[in-house]
From Swiss-Prot:
GO terms for cellular component: cytosol. Keywords: Cytoplasm, Methyltransferase, S-adenosyl-L-methionine, Transferase, tRNA processing. This is tRNA (guanine-N(1)-)-methyltransferase. InterPro entries: Alpha/beta_knot_MTases, tRNA_m1G_MeTrfase_C_sf, tRNA_m1G_MeTrfase_TrmD, tRNA_m1G_MTases_N, tRNA_MeTrfase_TRMD/TRM10. It is found in: Cytoplasm. It comes from Bacillus cereus (strain G9842).
């Protein structure tokens, strides 16, 4: 996979892209990450990438020319049209399902904005997706693009050493992940549940499944709204409700 990030602040990505999973993914050649300063594409004699909004108002608006030119340059040798994703608080809420969808693409371009916003022609004629990572305000789209990049890249084949850990992650199964414990079995009187030390894998799997359901019901009940619960999950959920 190829991921290009269009930004005015490329230095922000050095630490994130040069460590942990993203670093390993690049070393394994599972992904090619490029950070591009779209100011390099401006034709303005003052090297500017923004201007005052027509009709007046506060703030500056990113002009279309440098962003259009940057995307066109990055895709001039690409046979398949890439997904061009605008980081935008008005966009579709980012979810695990969206991450899985994007992980199936060959080429992604993330556009990170600043200032008051983007010229609307960028939205209408250039991008394929607009994505938001939450209902809050950030200084720019850089942090959002880092979050999405990490979420997508870890899904690529061969990136994670243990495929099972990826499958069991919160949201991957539609439920929040079950609790985890490690040594010691008794820490200051706080004990690990007996079932986890029983060696009975069937009972352990059932405990983890039920605890995932419990945690989801308690912390994110909205995730259960569209879930087609199995007969066993319905039984467990009734037990969980009685235990509350």
């Amino acid at each position: 996979m190829k991921i290009d990030i269009l930004t005015l602040f490329p230095d922000m990505f050095t630490g994130v892209f040069g460590s942990s999973i993203l670093k390993k993914a690049q070393e394994k050649e599972a992904v090619n990450l490029r950070v591009v300063n779209f100011r390099d594409y401006t034709t303005s004699k003052h090297n500017s990438v923004d201007d005052y909004p027509y009709g007046g108002g506060a703030g500056m608006v990113l002009t279309p020319q440098p962003i259009f030119d940057a995307v066109e340059d990055l895709t001039k040798e690409t046979e398949r049209k890439p997904r061009v994703v605008l980081m935008c608080p008005q966009g579709e809420r980012f979810t695990q399902k969206k991450a899985e969808e994007l992980a199936g693409e060959e080429h992604l371009i993330f556009v990170c904005g600043h200032y008051e916003g983007y010229d609307e022609r960028i939205r209408e004629h250039l991008v394929t997706d607009e994505i938001s990572i939450g209902d809050y305000v950030l200084t720019g789209g850089e942090l959002a693009s880092m979050v999405i990049t990490d979420s997508v890249v870890r899904l690529l084949p061969g990136v994670l050493g243990n495929h099972a850990s990826q499958v069991e992650d919160s949201f991957s199964t539609g439920l929040l992940e079950h609790p985890h414990y490690t040594r010691p079995a008794d820490f200051r009187g706080m004990k690990v549940p007996d079932v986890l030390m029983s060696g009975n894998h069937k009972n352990i799997d059932e405990w983890r499944h039920k605890e995932s359901l419990r945690r989801t019901y308690t912390r994110r009940p909205d995730l259960l709204d569209d879930r087609d619960l199995s007969k066993q999950e319905k039984k467990w959920l009734e037990e969980i409700k009685r235990e509350q």
